Amino acid sequence: MTVDLLLGLQWGDEGKGKIVDVLTSNYDIIARFQGGPNAGHTLEFDGIKHVLRTIPSGIFHKDSVNIIGNGVVIDPVVFQKEIEGLEKFNLDIKKKLIISRKAHLILPTHRLLDAASEASKGKAKIGSTLKGIGPTYMDKTGRNGLRVGDIELEDFKERYRSLADKHEAMIAFYDVNIQYNLAELEKEFFEAIEELKKLDFIDSEEYMHQAQKAGKSILCEGAQGSLLDVDFGTYPFVTSSNTTAAGACTGLGIAPNKIKEVYGIFKAYVTRVGSGPFPTELFDEVGATMARVGNEFGSVTGRQRRCGWLDLVALKYAVQVNGVTQLMMMKGDVLSGFETLKVCTEYNYKGQNISHFPYNIEPENVTPVYKEFKGWKQDLTGLTTYDQLPVELKEYIEFIEKEIEVPIKIVSVGPDRKQTITK
């Protein structure tokens, strides 16, 4: 029996989907434990790019069972479109995908609430993806939400109507101009609900417990990144769920002492989408080059990601919070061609150098302290072994390992699953 955990250590978009895809053959079960369709996991193989939003990244492997856990929020409409997008691969979705009855549903009015709330904030917007994630988690913690298991109840539509009416009153309270046709949105929603009913719903915590007793190997898949965690991220510019290791326990019903390996995924540089502090952000041609070469555009929103140098203060913090046992560095190939690379090793925080991640990292409080490294010119995308990597990249990797005190086991040198070097 093995229960391992894979999660992102930055502000999301680290490349988790690719690594899950690479590792899936080692596991019987891939289980998503938090987030919703605001996250996009990008996989690329055979020259074709695939973006998954809610479905776990093991769906393309014939022998794996994929679980959507109780910590996930599901938009039935988006979910149906995601399944339709997989039909061309002739996958047995009903056999390969099962859903926790305790996962919460995103209603059309959740999305409208999200838009109304964001519009009302003016310049103080937090950069919401407007997918209804925040309002759904608010209903969950406020004990008002609807769950997947409620679909099976005879009075589901009455429960829906009661909650949707509350939402409409809240939307009116915001007093912003949002145009919508709720009747049309609800028609689409209930059609998607009927499709959702065709899948198997489970009591996921019992399923996971029995799987562990049977000796099954399980990989828990996180969405977004640790610095977006509602408790440990750069609040309020965060998501509404726990993206850290603790979220796997509450989002799947797995006991903490059952988790063995914690795989931490990070980019060789840093990106962020939307608003929020970003100490190492670059506003020059270097940052623009990173975005262009790295194709740094959100897989869900399409928004260009902000780019910056690797931040070891933030990375060390994420490693500590998650108890990471192995690191995996993504997009090493994007840094090819830069004369000089920089790594933030400390923050100058209110005039004093510190090496820990403080409560407030707004620009007026934090200035990054950098160590410079010599860059490399070599194209990495065709390399297959660690020994083939340029010496400058090896020095970069070894410095990170020394500072973080966790080994880097995988270096990604391209988007395809084959462009993955094991160290």
Curated annotation (Swiss-Prot):
It comes from the Bacteria. SUPFAM superfamilies: P-loop containing nucleoside triphosphate hydrolases. The keyword Magnesium applies. PROSITE patterns: ADENYLOSUCCIN_SYN_1 (PS01266), ADENYLOSUCCIN_SYN_2 (PS00513). GTP binds at residues 12-18, 40-42, 305, 331-333, 412-414. It catalyses: IMP + L-aspartate + GTP = N(6)-(1,2-dicarboxyethyl)-AMP + GDP + phosphate + 2 H(+). Pathway: Purine metabolism; AMP biosynthesis via de novo pathway; AMP from IMP: step 1/2. IMP binds at D13, E14, G15, K16, N38, A39, G40, H41, T129, R143, Q224, T239, R303. Keywords: Cytoplasm, GTP-binding, Ligase, Magnesium, Metal-binding, Nucleotide-binding, Purine biosynthesis. Mg(2+) binds at D13, G40. PANTHER family: ADENYLOSUCCINATE SYNTHETASE. This is Adenylosuccinate synthetase.
